[in-house]
Amino acid sequence: ELLSSVRAISYASGSKFPSGGLCTAGYCVGNEMTISLLSKIEKHLLLCDNEATAEQYKILANQLPSMNNRIDEAYQNTRDFVNFISKTLPGAKINFVTDDLASLSFKPSVFSLDLPTKGVTDEEREIYKRKLNLRLINLMISQIPNESKFCVSYGQLKGSYWTIPATSTQGTTKEGDKDYIVRVSIAPSINIELHKKVFMEFVTEI
């Protein structure tokens, strides 16, 4: 409704929820006011021979019918895990969607975790936190190797994906602006209770 009176185009990466990570082709959808623009996009795809392949179309056609359910299930798993972390490690700062936004159907399944740190100086606190980040990630992937991965990903069919933006997606960002936090992506198919158990082990160790 907010964008119905202006030209709006939404692009979706096919490697995320549309295909569940099974292909890379993306697609865009526009409202009625973008018809003239969509025809130009179509022309561009044809001129550049950049249209999705038959196999990519097949994968998307098979996966798209379940996409909304997978998005909802992944969100519910993420919300469950976030709530657990909040209770077991109240000193952690968590960046995740609010319940109000989720009620409007904005349901991401990724959150950022700023672990509590300690030390006398800012430098000591930063060094400790960075070590703690790696300690948590290494524990998750060593204890749950079939589901936890140390990489950037989103919208996959199963498992959890752990990364530190400062050393992955923020490679070209100047050092002072990098985020040395933990970013976690949760899939619709996951043993969330096992993840809670391992996270509790981490909490008891620190």
What is each model feature region?
Residues E1-I9:
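Catalytic PLP-binding core of fold-type I/II PLP enzymes
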Residues A8-K178, I186-N191, V198:
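Active-site C-terminal subdomain of aminotransferase-like
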Residues E205-I206:
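C-terminal accessory/interaction regions of large nucleic acid-associated machines
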